[in-house]
Every structure is written in C-alpha cells, then in structure tokens.
Amino acid sequence: MSEPLIVGIRHHSPACARLVKSLIESQRPRYVLIEGPADFNDRVDELFLAHQLPVAIYSYCQYQDGAAPGRGAWTPFAEFSPEWQALQAARRIQAQTYFIDLPCWAQSEEEDDSPDTQEESQTLLLRATRMDNSDTLWDHLFEDESQQTALPSALAHYFAQLRGDSPGDALNRQREAFMARWITWAMQQNNGDVLVVCGGWHAPAPVSYSHLTLPT
C-alpha cells in the first residue's frame, strides 16, 4: 500500500463499524490510526479492561485564568462505534494503534466566522432526496447490510459531496493538520500499511505527507 487507507466514517454508525472491522481484518495493516485524543495514547490499554459498554474518555483543561470556564470533550465508545471496533480489531491483529486527534487543551481559542458549509451541503442533499433529516437520509443510504460491498465507495462519494472544496473552519484545519502529521509519521516508518479511521468530514481533506514529524 503506497498510500494510507483513509476510512471516513460516521460516529456510532453500525454500518461503518462493520466496515472498519472487516477492512482491518482483511487488510491487516501495521498501523491503525484512529480519530481520538492523542494525549490518551499512553493509557489506551485501559480501554481493554473489563468495561461494560458504553464507555467514554473525558478530556478537560482549565485555562490559566481561573475565572474563565475550562474546556471539555467526550470521546464515547459503544459496541457499534467504528472507533471501538477499530481498537478491538487492531488489537487482535497486533497492529500498532494510536489516537491521532488534537487534544482539547491544544485547540485554538480563536473565534472563527467561517460559513458552515457542511450544514449547507446537508440541506441541499435533504432537499434533493426529500428526506426529513440527516439521520433518516443516512439510514436510507447506508444502514443496510446488503449494501456492504458498495459501502466504501458510497461513503467516499457522500463525504466528498458534504465537504466539497471547503477548507473547513480554523479548528478543523488545526485538527486535520495534526492528524496529517501522525499519518505522515506512520507512512515514513516504511514497515507496513497504514489504515486511518476518522470522521468522514475529515477524510476528503487534502493532506501533505512531506516534511512532517510525529507530534509531541
């Protein structure tokens, strides 16, 4: 595999969970990189304890100005979460597994008034398909086990339509640059294939694989 296999998913989608599990088991990559808080990597083994699902990672940071509210973020896992199935399948094949998303404490505090192109694209899709909401549309398009063989290409097309040529807002650009550095590092090891599991909105984003190193 000369390039990473980037699997864009919808969080908590059973269809995407099945797809991720199947791809990891069939492709047997050396590295499985998952959208999740990178500062939890040293403790990832805790997720393999005898938990009763659902479970979640909660990340929190308090700003130096004690009067200002802190920032928190949840990373939830259920049996039907693609990220959970990626963790389990990667462990079974003994792949090196890392979370690659920017920790909440490192995210920019700057306001961004970029237009929400994702919502605009979603509205156009709903209008074209005459569906009531995005959940109904998703179920209609993807949550059918008989569609599994065509699922990868269908997902790629769907998320490309949602993203279009939008660069994303400042936070998404920051997160995607961070994820790209992890992908670059894994590719530069030159000792096995790389499979990436991330939200579909991020999957079509242009990624440069040169002059980047492992985030610290």
Language-model features, listed with the residues they occupy:
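Beta-strand elements within well-structured catalytic alpha/beta cores of enzymes
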Residues: 9, 30-34, 183, 193-200
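A short acidic-Thr-Gly-centered motif at the start of a beta-strand
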Residues: 1, 181-191
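Conserved small/polar residues in nucleotide/adenosyl-binding loops
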Residues: 210-216
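Glycine-rich phosphate-binding "P-loop"
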Residues: 150-181
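Short, glycine/acidic-rich beta->alpha junctions
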Residues: 12-16, 78-82, 175-179, 187-188, ...
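Structured, acidic catalytic/metal-binding patches in enzyme active sites
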Residues: 1-161
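Short active-site loop/helix that positions an aromatic residue
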Residues: 203-209
